[in-house]
């Protein structure tokens, strides 16, 4: 017999009755039933009930066992009485009578319980992550992650992609976030950087003649944490292809993403990839107040400025006299009560706005009537025109925000999400995907008038050089994101592979040729030797697992995550270096004032 186990703790059933077996695992819980000791023995695969009575030669040793001790037992498999069968677990028809026991590892008093559903502070969970990971939900999440990555690899290989690895130590190349710098011992005063993404390397692969690349790539960014973002590192499905159009990239990655969500989505609806809408960045902001809209929510915002221009509602009427302003409506089907409207108005105030105007429609003495402060101020004719435009009726409401879109759009988008949630309009059993396209490359600083990059400067401008010779604010990039349920899941672009167009694109934003060559010299030089048209994208592994596991926090699907302050409480990182290390690197730490 094997030194530690003949079977796992999920393997035994009635067919093993009468056999002598060996199991190893952790004591999930201990129960004393009138002198009989029952232990739920747990390993990675499941739980088996083992037991001993006072006549057992090792009963005294078994009495000493406590939760989360690691033990090995030998015993005989016996069938449970019919009334004691536990149909919820694979081993529920049997139990093992212990004949021998060995304690493989004792446990101190537990700072958090593995058994049960009790919640613990995140600080405790991360400090004792090895205990937290023993819990069933966490084991399930990590196995899901492993299986999902395996499925992704298989799907990419099936499409003719090859997996190649890119460097983990490279040059600093600002890509929208801060770099993690690594000092060089051999070159004092100089630094490497951990890559924010394999972006330049994968493009250089295309220049090198490789046609289809992918990688499950680690990425390192010194970012502020969010619930859906790790503050230090994350993994992405990174891919690139030569001689492709934007639609080719969509047709390649969409079946991979859809297939993974169908395989691991536990029956939730996944729209067919050919049904995923392509929404312009401009329309996404207009309709949903976000470039990563949650399309499970059917609410679509609309511009209703004309109904308020010159109206009796002075706030909006005067606002519309200013250049670049508009009034936007958020329809709220079934939200037609004053209580709900007041609640949403309070939401807007918490978001930093003065409030949110509203109208709701109800049954009156003479039929349907509009109610709310706005309805009184603008009159029945304008109110009716708004209702008809929005397609609303009795029991419905509409909320209104105004100003320059950039000042209220994000809040409007969040309000749309809250309305969808509170009115049960958002379909929880669906993964709703949408391609966001036609991103503007440039934006103008309203105070300085300076033109700068708004989005990826390395995407090929739609229209090429001709577009760059026109109004920069009209230039759209061959850039795209894939949104799912309110999260950005994929981001990519058709790349700018022509040096002269790249130099021109950066020149518009105030970057000279020398600066571009200094910062991106490796890639720019390579493009002078016959670079092919190429494009690709990257999909966030952590976010995909988070959605599939139905978790709200990304740390629930990362094995050993940092906390919100970018600290590893378990490994005590970051830590102060030893003086010898600093001397070897030629570095000195300058004390910071508190």
Swiss-Prot record:
<dbReference type="InterPro" id="IPR012340">
    <property type="entry name" value="NA-bd_OB-fold"/>
</dbReference>
<dbReference type="GO" id="GO:0003676">
    <property type="term" value="F:nucleic acid binding"/>
</dbReference>
<keyword id="KW-0648">Protein biosynthesis</keyword>
<keyword id="KW-0067">ATP-binding</keyword>
<feature type="binding site">
    <location>
        <position position="488"/>
    </location>
    <ligand>
        <name>ATP</name>
    </ligand>
</feature>
<dbReference type="GO" id="GO:0005737">
    <property type="term" value="C:cytoplasm"/>
</dbReference>
<feature type="binding site">
    <location>
        <position position="221"/>
    </location>
    <ligand>
        <name>L-aspartate</name>
    </ligand>
</feature>
<dbReference type="GO" id="GO:0006422">
    <property type="term" value="P:aspartyl-tRNA aminoacylation"/>
</dbReference>
<feature type="binding site">
    <location>
        <position position="495"/>
    </location>
    <ligand>
        <name>L-aspartate</name>
    </ligand>
</feature>
<dbReference type="Pfam" id="PF01336">
    <property type="entry name" value="tRNA_anti-codon"/>
</dbReference>
<comment type="subunit">
    <text>Homodimer.</text>
</comment>
<dbReference type="Pfam" id="PF00152">
    <property type="entry name" value="tRNA-synt_2"/>
</dbReference>
<comment type="function">
    <text>Aspartyl-tRNA synthetase with relaxed tRNA specificity since it is able to aspartylate not only its cognate tRNA(Asp) but also tRNA(Asn). Reaction proceeds in two steps: L-aspartate is first activated by ATP to form Asp-AMP and then transferred to the acceptor end of tRNA(Asp/Asn).</text>
</comment>
<keyword id="KW-0436">Ligase</keyword>
<comment type="similarity">
    <text>Belongs to the class-II aminoacyl-tRNA synthetase family. Type 1 subfamily.</text>
</comment>
<dbReference type="InterPro" id="IPR004364">
    <property type="entry name" value="Aa-tRNA-synt_II"/>
</dbReference>
<dbReference type="InterPro" id="IPR004115">
    <property type="entry name" value="GAD-like_sf"/>
</dbReference>
<dbReference type="InterPro" id="IPR045864">
    <property type="entry name" value="aa-tRNA-synth_II/BPL/LPL"/>
</dbReference>
<dbReference type="Pfam" id="PF02938">
    <property type="entry name" value="GAD"/>
</dbReference>
<dbReference type="GO" id="GO:0005524">
    <property type="term" value="F:ATP binding"/>
</dbReference>
<feature type="binding site">
    <location>
        <begin position="221"/>
        <end position="223"/>
    </location>
    <ligand>
        <name>ATP</name>
    </ligand>
</feature>
<dbReference type="InterPro" id="IPR029351">
    <property type="entry name" value="GAD_dom"/>
</dbReference>
<dbReference type="InterPro" id="IPR047089">
    <property type="entry name" value="Asp-tRNA-ligase_1_N"/>
</dbReference>
<keyword id="KW-0547">Nucleotide-binding</keyword>
<dbReference type="InterPro" id="IPR002312">
    <property type="entry name" value="Asp/Asn-tRNA-synth_IIb"/>
</dbReference>
<feature type="site" description="Important for tRNA non-discrimination">
    <location>
        <position position="33"/>
    </location>
</feature>
<dbReference type="GO" id="GO:0004815">
    <property type="term" value="F:aspartate-tRNA ligase activity"/>
</dbReference>
<feature type="binding site">
    <location>
        <position position="175"/>
    </location>
    <ligand>
        <name>L-aspartate</name>
    </ligand>
</feature>
<protein>
    <recommendedName>
        <fullName>Aspartate--tRNA(Asp/Asn) ligase</fullName>
        <ecNumber>6.1.1.23</ecNumber>
    </recommendedName>
</protein>
<dbReference type="InterPro" id="IPR006195">
    <property type="entry name" value="aa-tRNA-synth_II"/>
</dbReference>
<dbReference type="InterPro" id="IPR047090">
    <property type="entry name" value="AspRS_core"/>
</dbReference>
<dbReference type="InterPro" id="IPR004365">
    <property type="entry name" value="NA-bd_OB_tRNA"/>
</dbReference>
<feature type="region of interest" description="Aspartate">
    <location>
        <begin position="199"/>
        <end position="202"/>
    </location>
</feature>
<dbReference type="GO" id="GO:0050560">
    <property type="term" value="F:aspartate-tRNA(Asn) ligase activity"/>
</dbReference>
<feature type="binding site">
    <location>
        <begin position="540"/>
        <end position="543"/>
    </location>
    <ligand>
        <name>ATP</name>
    </ligand>
</feature>
<feature type="binding site">
    <location>
        <position position="455"/>
    </location>
    <ligand>
        <name>L-aspartate</name>
    </ligand>
</feature>
<keyword id="KW-0030">Aminoacyl-tRNA synthetase</keyword>
<dbReference type="InterPro" id="IPR004524">
    <property type="entry name" value="Asp-tRNA-ligase_1"/>
</dbReference>
<keyword id="KW-0963">Cytoplasm</keyword>
């Amino acid at each position: 017999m094997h030194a530690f186990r003949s079977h796992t703790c999920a393997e035994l059933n009635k067919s093993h009755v009468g056999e002598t077996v060996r199991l190893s695992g952790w004591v999930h819980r201990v129960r004393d039933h009138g002198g009989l000791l029952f232990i739920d023995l747990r390993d990675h695969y499941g739980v088996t009930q083992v037991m001993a009575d006072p006549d057992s030669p090792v009963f005294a040793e078994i009495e000493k066992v406590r939760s989360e001790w690691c033990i090995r037992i030998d015993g005989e498999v016996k069938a449970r009485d019919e009334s004691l069968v536990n149909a919820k677990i694979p081993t529920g028809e049997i139990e093992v009578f212990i004949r021998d026991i060995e304690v493989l590892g004792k446990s101190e008093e537990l700072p958090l319980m593995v058994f049960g559903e009790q919640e613990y502070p995140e600080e405790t969970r991360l400090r004792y992550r090895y205990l937290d990971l023993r819990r069933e939900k966490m084991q399930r999440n990590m196995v899901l992650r492993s299986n999902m990555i395996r499925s992704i690899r298989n799907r990419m290989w099936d499409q003719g992609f090859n997996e190649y690895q890119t460097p983990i130590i490279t040059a600093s190349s600002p890509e929208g976030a801060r770099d993690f710098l690594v000092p060089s011992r051999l070159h004092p005063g100089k630094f490497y950087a951990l890559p924010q993404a394999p972006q330049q390397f994968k493009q250089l692969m295309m220049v090198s003649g490789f046609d289809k690349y992918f990688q499950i790539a680690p990425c390192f960014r010194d970012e502020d944490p969010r619930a859906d973002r790790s503050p230090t590192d994350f993994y992405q499905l990174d891919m690139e292809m030569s001689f492709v159009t934007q639609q080719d990239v969509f047709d390649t990655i969409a079946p991979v993403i859809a297939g993974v969500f169908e395989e691991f989505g536990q029956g939730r609806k996944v729209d067919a990839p050919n049904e995923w809408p392509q929404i312009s960045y401009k329309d996404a902001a207009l309709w949903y107040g976000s470039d990563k809209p949650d399309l499970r929510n059917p609410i679509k915002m609309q511009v209703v400025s004309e109904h308020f221009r010159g109206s009796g509602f002075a706030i909006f009427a005067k606002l519309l006299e200013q250049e670049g302003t508009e009034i936007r409506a958020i329809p709220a089907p079934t939200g037609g009560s004053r209580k709900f409207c007041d609640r949403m108005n309070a939401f807007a105030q918490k978001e930093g706005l003065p409030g949110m105007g509203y109208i709701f429609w109800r049954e009156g003495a003479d039929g349907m009537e509009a109610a709310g402060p706005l309805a009184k101020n603008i009159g029945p004719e304008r109110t009716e025109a708004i209702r008809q435009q929005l397609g609303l009726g009795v029991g419905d409401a509409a909320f209104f925000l105004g100003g320059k879109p950039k000042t209220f759009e994000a809040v409007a988008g969040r309000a749309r999400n809250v309305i969808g949630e509170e009115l049960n309009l958002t379909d929880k059993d669906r993964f709703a995907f949408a391609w966001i396209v036609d991103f503007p490359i440039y934006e103008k600083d309203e105070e300085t008038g300076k033109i700068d990059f708004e989005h990826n400067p390395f995407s090929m401008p739609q229209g090429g050089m001709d577009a760059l010779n026109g109004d920069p604010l009209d230039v759209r990039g061959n850039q795209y994101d894939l949104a799912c349920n309110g999260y950005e899941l994929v981001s990519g672009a058709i790349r700018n592979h022509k040096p002269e167009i790249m130099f021109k694109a950066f020149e518009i934003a105030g970057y000279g040729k020398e600066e571009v060559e200094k910062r991106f010299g490796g890639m720019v030089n390579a493009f002078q030797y016959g670079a092919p048209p190429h494009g690709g994208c990257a999909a966030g592994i952590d976010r995909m697992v988070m959605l599939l596991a139905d978790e709200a926090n990304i740390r629930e699907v990362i094995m050993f995550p940092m906390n919100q302050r970018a600290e590893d409480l378990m490994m005590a990182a970051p830590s102060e270096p030893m003086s010898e290390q600093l001397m070897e690197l030629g570095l000195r730490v300058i004390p910071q004032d508190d």
